[in-house]
Amino acid sequence: EGNALFLEALGRYLEAWLAELDLALAEKRVALNEAQLAAAKAQEAQGQATFKDVLEAESALAEAKASLFAAQNARALASARLERILGRAVAPKALPLPQDPPSLEEALAALENRPDVALARLRLEEAEAALAQASRDRALPQGSFSLSLAQGGLDLSLSLDLGAGALGYALGYTALGAAEGTSLRAGASLPLFAPVQEANQKVLENRVAQAKLALEAALKDGELDLRQKHQARLLAEAQLAAAETSLKAAEASLETAKKRLQAGTGTRLEVLQAEVGLLQAQRTLEQAKANLLQAHYALMDAMGIDLLGGER
């Protein structure tokens, strides 16, 4: 299905984009831990730190390098997955956020557009049509019409079954004693007791009942799915707003650290720490955007919208 392919490709793209950010954050953390280790060694030489402080800084640096190695592998794996699904290498970037999200009322109004609901309704219509046809066939009388003509030993007869719509004929020849004349016969029958037709009627009635239950279930499940996905989108929007606030705070912290460094009241280490905090806030923001994108398109899919722009 096109929508499933779109959602999978979107997930792989966002995975690769976030892996790029994770790598940049891991590199910055290594730089920070290297600076912290250098500071610890300098403080130890001045008697302001202990050897234990140096060991802890070395351990933190080793962990940061291990995280960097893991981030490099994760980025390579995410890039390979993205290339496999797209068929070519792509450098991921931030995607624009969707505009004009649907309201809950608009989402629920699209319930009939869902493929599962449409399929359940189609099956009900087919079952009802089959039952109606069987009821008509059982109620219609079975009629027949026949015409026979004998002339000079030649016998010709025609018959018409009105119920089946079948026309038959017969041609015969009698050498001796042939009677001449014409006869016309017509008849009709109304089935009062037809066990086979009644059994078939029951089967079709059961199919209609089952189809109605299936449609009701599809409508209930579809409404619940739409409500859940709409709620998930609202939650993603709230998380995005919180991430934007955190980013502003991180930007302010970095600006303060830079001003303190210029004024001689701060250190380069404080600036590095603020830069790491800013990268972390940016990573959190991009994760929130990715969650919003996936929640939005999952809602569009639940509404029965073709994400590739065609017709479902």
Enumerate the language-model features and the residues they cover:
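Sec/SRP-type N-terminal targeting helices
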Residues: G2-A4, E27, K52, E56, ...
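Active/binding-pocket-proximal capping segment
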Residues: Q151, E205-Q210, S246-A257, G277
